[in-house]
């Protein structure tokens, strides 16, 4: 399987007939109400059948920053409580996702991360993807806020016939 990023909003995935994918969105991974046990169960089921993982957007909730009007200290996981909230969230996410990094192909942006980027001049999705790739050697791509995932499916039994599927993603 080969993934390529064309610009900020187009990701191409060359795969084979029969390849499987787990498509996720709005994980809000750092929120206390994120059911990580259920998420882990779904991820491990996907990995057991050889599926790759794509995350559409809002990977993080990340709404508890200093300048967020929606912030509530009750909505911070204990491991993220500290003066370096953003760093704690990203570092803990990288640690949790490291064992799945080779199965993760793509992480898109959402309104939560983009709001933080505007207020704090920090791109937490990019930071997460870059740090995960650095620590694990994976090749996870980050996408735009909305865009296209283009699947090109080769069919070995038919030798030259390929199918192309274009999937729009947005929040």
Predicted regions and their residues:
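His/acidic metal-ligating clusters that form di-metal
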Residues: 103-106, 126, 130-171
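Polar low-complexity intrinsically disordered regions
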Residues: 1-2, 99-100, 160-161
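Core catalytic region of metal-dependent phosphoesterases/phosphodiesterases
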Residues: 9-20, 24, 29-141
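Short glycine- and acidic-rich boundary segments immediately preceding or forming the N-terminal edge
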Residues: 1-11
């Amino acid at each position: 399987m080969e993934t390529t990023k064309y610009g900020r909003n187009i990701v191409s995935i060359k795969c084979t007939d029969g390849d499987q994918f787990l498509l996720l969105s709005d994980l809000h991974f750092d929120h206390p109400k994120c059911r990580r046990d259920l998420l882990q169960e779904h991820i491990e089921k996907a990995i057991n059948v050889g599926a790759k993982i794509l995350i559409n957007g809002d990977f993080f909730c990340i709404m508890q920053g200093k300048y967020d009007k929606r912030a509530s200290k009750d909505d911070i996981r204990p491991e993220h409580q500290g003066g370096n909230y953003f760093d704690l969230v990203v570092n803990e996410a990288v640690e949790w996702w490291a064992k799945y990094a080779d199965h993760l192909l793509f992480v898109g942006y959402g309104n939560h991360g983009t709001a933080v980027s505007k207020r704090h001049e920090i791109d937490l999705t990019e930071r997460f993807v870059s740090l995960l790739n650095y620590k694990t050697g994976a090749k996870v791509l980050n996408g735009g806020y909305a865009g296209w995932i283009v699947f090109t499916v080769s069919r070995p039994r038919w030798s030259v016939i390929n199918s192309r599927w274009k999937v729009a993603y947005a929040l």
